[in-house]
Amino acid sequence: VKAHELITSRTDHPLHVGITEAGTLFSGNIKSAVGLGIILYQGIGDTIRVSLTGDPLEEIKSAKRILKTLGLRKGGIEVVSCPTCGRTQIDLIGLANQVETLVQGYDLDIKVAVMGCVVNGPGEAKEADLGVAGGKGVGILIKKGEIVKKVPESELLSVLKDELDHWGK
């Protein structure tokens, strides 16, 4: 971070920023998000590079997500999910991972919430464009904070996919 701040104070040339040899997917993403977040928040940098020990495609996904989180990039669905708690009545971790995999095929600039119970899920998903929640065999689809459909829990993913396929049409 200090090196980027120093060079920016001494030149007007475009600057490529990154955290070199950040590490594995887990630790490298954390180091890159923190380091690049600080640098980019200060308005430093014209291009970025995330360096991870692993698949280069993961570097691209990470870079895009860092930019989107900072409000510097549009496009790509943001998935949010609640932490597991005593009210969780669904395989929330599994469902959230399935939703993250599903949304990679879409270039929509929306937020999708994955909630662990049908009681608090709709309220917690209010800021999302779409959301799913479930428990005790029942699933709900939430659109702009309103419950729009009840389905068997096993159909949540396919109902969400249908909504994404028709989003904005």
PLM regions with names:
Residues 39, 82, 117, 125, ...:
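Conserved, mostly hydrophobic/aromatic
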Residues 18-30, 112-120, 134:
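Glycine-rich beta-to-alpha transition loops that act as phosphate-gripper elements at the mouths
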Residues 95-126:
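Hydrophobic alpha-helical bundle architecture
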Residues 19-20, 42, 52, 85, ...:
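Fold-independent oxyanion-binding glycine-rich loops
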Residues 1-107:
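Catalytic alpha/beta core domains of metabolic enzymes, predominantly
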Residues 136-142, 146-168:
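Beta-strand/loop-dominated core regions that host nucleotide or nucleotide-derived cofactor-binding catalytic loops
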